[in-house]
């Protein structure tokens, strides 16, 4: 077997392989002998068919199978010989084959990038210093009351926290546009669901009134044809409703399954949940900064095959979030997921090198702690812990989480870390890209 390796573009490689004619012929003869032992042909006993007849009837298909097998086996031998680590499925490019002659073919594929970690001491992290204060618990209790509130129709003018039912028709330069019309549209004010200016235009009006609202679509609006466009909405306000907040009494507290149905018991349970969320938020905020710093210091090429695979994963996750239509999700434009997929692949490759460099292995005590922390949010934590312990896939996933945390901590040890006083709501409203 003769082997040569070419670099095509970026991480692309092309291995050229030539298989000697006698190697092919020996393999064909050997396979024909195996076939002769199994075939049944009229006029001959099984296993007694003359080889020339076996070759005449099965030679072409056997030769084709042998060539396919040799191509795969020789490719494996070639990448072992050349110490190549391919990514994804290879593309075989067979050359012209003539009986009795050497056979040449090529295999095209991508390889993993060579990762050399750089700039780890330049990573800067601003760690939030934050605690759950009594005022934060008060705000959360207010939120819980609003979530459990009933709505009562009113003749008052619409306010910033009311719920309204409207009909509207939007136009741009006098022309209607797709998605610009709705009937009996229920809008809870103050949640930022509508484009800027729409809710403000509703405030102060009463049920039964009709009016126009002028707005401008944001430059980053998701619909390309509407970005930055000025629009007018003709609105009919059909109903205004105000919240009726429940009392913070025993009946209200029982809705949340709290053992101690006093207000103090509810506050304690709310605080415990907020502190758990806060711990995760601080951890995620630090992780995001570490990952961002790692990516900024190490701009690596990523194999397209890995990006494609990650895009498929993201599409399936999108399907699970929005109704489970996987077929429809897989048809979504790849551009929607490409940047996130590239980031994930880069992070995986870089953290993989951190793990290799530091010879990290998942800390089983950390794995157990992560499972216990996650299980504490459920009604029966013990049952959840036992379920994880019996499920190898879930345990492996949690070990990967632990290992990733350990890699981030290894990076954090060499990072420039400062602390910043931060409010609970400020931290919880910060996005996390990691």
From Swiss-Prot:
A Pfam family in this protein? Trigger_N
| PPIase FKBP-type domain ranges (all copies) | 161-246
Alphabetized, the UniProt keywords read: Cell cycle, Cell division, Chaperone, Cytoplasm, Isomerase, Rotamase
Main localisation: cytoplasm
Q: Which domain of life is it from?
A: Bacteria
PROSITE patterns (alphabetical): FKBP_PPIASE
Q: What class of enzyme is it?
A: isomerase
Q: Catalyzes what? A: [protein]-peptidylproline (omega=180) = [protein]-peptidylproline (omega=0)
Tell where it localizes.
Cytoplasm
EC number in record = 5.2.1.8
Cite a single GO MF annotation: protein folding chaperone
What are the GO BP annotations of this UniProt entry? 'de novo' cotranslational protein folding; cell division; chaperone-mediated protein folding; protein transport; protein unfolding
A GO cellular component annotation here is: cytoplasm
Which family does this protein fall into? Answer: Belongs to the FKBP-type PPIase family. Tig subfamily.
Entry text on domains: Consists of 3 domains; the N-terminus binds the ribosome, the middle domain has PPIase activity, while the C-terminus has intrinsic chaperone activity on its own.
* Its job: Involved in protein export. Acts as a chaperone by maintaining the newly synthesized protein in an open conformation. Functions as a peptidyl-prolyl cis-trans isomerase.
The name under which this protein is listed is: Trigger factor
Write the lineage as a comma-separated list: Bacteria, Pseudomonadati, Pseudomonadota, Gammaproteobacteria, Enterobacterales
Q: What's the name of its gene?
A: tig
């Amino acid at each position: 077997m003769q082997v040569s390796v070419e670099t095509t573009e970026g991480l692309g490689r092309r291995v050229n392989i030539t298989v000697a004619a006698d190697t092919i012929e020996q393999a064909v003869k050997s396979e024909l002998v195996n076939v002769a032992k199994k075939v049944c042909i009229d006029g001959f006993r099984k296993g007694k068919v003359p080889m020339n007849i076996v070759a005449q009837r099965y030679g072409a298909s056997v030769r084709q199978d042998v060539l396919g097998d040799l191509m795969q086996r020789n490719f494996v031998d070639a990448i072992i010989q050349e110490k190549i680590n391919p990514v994804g499925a290879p593309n075989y490019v067979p050359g012209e084959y003539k009986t009795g002659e050497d056979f040449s073919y090529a295999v095209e594929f991508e390889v993993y990038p060579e990762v050399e970690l750089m700039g780890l001491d330049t990573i800067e992290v601003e760690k939030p210093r934050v605690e759950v204060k009594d005022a934060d618990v008060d705000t959360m209790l207010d939120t819980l009351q609003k979530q459990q509130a009933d709505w009562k129709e009113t003749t008052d003018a619409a306010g910033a926290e009311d719920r309204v039912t409207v009909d509207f028709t939007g136009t741009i330069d006098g022309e209607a546009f797709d998605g610009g019309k709705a009937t009996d549209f229920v809008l809870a004010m103050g949640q930022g669901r509508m484009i800027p200016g729409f809710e403000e235009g509703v405030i102060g009006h009463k049920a039964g009134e009709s009016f126009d609202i002028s707005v401008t679509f944001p430059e980053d609006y998701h619909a390309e044809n509407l970005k930055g466009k000025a629009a007018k909405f003709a609105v009919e306000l059909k109903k205004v409703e105000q919240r009726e907040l429940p009392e913070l009494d025993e009946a209200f507290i029982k809705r949340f399954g709290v053992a101690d149905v006093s207000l103090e018991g509810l506050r304690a349970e709310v605080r415990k949940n907020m502190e758990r969320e806060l711990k995760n938020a601080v951890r995620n905020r630090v992780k995001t900064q570490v990952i961002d710093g790692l990516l900024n210091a190490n701009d690596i090429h990523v194999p397209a095959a890995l990006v494609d695979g990650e895009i498929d994963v993201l599409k399936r996750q999108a399907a699970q979030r929005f109704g489970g239509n996987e077929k429809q999700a897989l048809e979504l434009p790849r551009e929607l997921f490409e940047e996130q997929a590239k980031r994930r692949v880069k992070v995986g490759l870089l953290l993989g090198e951190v793990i290799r460099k530091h010879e990290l292995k998942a800390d089983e005590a950390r794995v157990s702690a992560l499972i216990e922390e996650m299980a504490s949010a459920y009604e029966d934590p013990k049952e959840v812990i036992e379920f994880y312990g019996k499920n190898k896939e879930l345990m492996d996933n949690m070990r990967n989480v632990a290992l990733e945390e350990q890699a981030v901590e290894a990076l954090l040890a060499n990072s420039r870390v400062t602390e910043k006083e931060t409010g609970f709501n400020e931290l919880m409203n910060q996005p996390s890209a990691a």
